[in-house]
Amino acid sequence: GYLGGYAAPAISYAAPAVSYAAPAVAYAAPAAVAPAALTSQSSNILRSYGNLGQVSTYTKTVDTPYSSVTKSDVRVSNDAIAHVAAPALAYAAPAAYAAPAYYH
């Protein structure tokens, strides 16, 4: 019910919800220095006259004091085979020769 008085609005003021924390920083021991690795890489393409065929080589090597790995790839291609069909040659079997019929 109505009590005849003036009611104040229900307003509350609070401090903003802000929290401050120390930054999360972790310090670790310095990383161990590993010995250097030696690497080498080479590639070569040898093409025939008229670029009808080619041989492609690729080699990569990684050497460390603990291991050694070598990867190599050799590919041979001949475009002349792909574009020129082999001639169709058919040979008949030789005729069978029997000894002549010879009667006495």
From Swiss-Prot:
<feature type="repeat" description="2">
    <location>
        <begin position="14"/>
        <end position="17"/>
    </location>
</feature>
<feature type="repeat" description="1">
    <location>
        <begin position="7"/>
        <end position="10"/>
    </location>
</feature>
<keyword id="KW-0193">Cuticle</keyword>
<dbReference type="Pfam" id="PF11018">
    <property type="entry name" value="Cuticle_3"/>
</dbReference>
<dbReference type="GO" id="GO:0042302">
    <property type="term" value="F:structural constituent of cuticle"/>
</dbReference>
<dbReference type="InterPro" id="IPR022727">
    <property type="entry name" value="Cuticle_C1"/>
</dbReference>
<feature type="repeat" description="3">
    <location>
        <begin position="21"/>
        <end position="24"/>
    </location>
</feature>
<feature type="repeat" description="7">
    <location>
        <begin position="98"/>
        <end position="101"/>
    </location>
</feature>
<feature type="repeat" description="5">
    <location>
        <begin position="85"/>
        <end position="88"/>
    </location>
</feature>
<keyword id="KW-0677">Repeat</keyword>
<feature type="repeat" description="4">
    <location>
        <begin position="28"/>
        <end position="31"/>
    </location>
</feature>
<protein>
    <recommendedName>
        <fullName>Cuticle protein 67, isoform B</fullName>
    </recommendedName>
</protein>
<feature type="repeat" description="6">
    <location>
        <begin position="92"/>
        <end position="95"/>
    </location>
</feature>
<comment type="function">
    <text>Component of the cuticle of migratory locust which contains more than 100 different structural proteins.</text>
</comment>
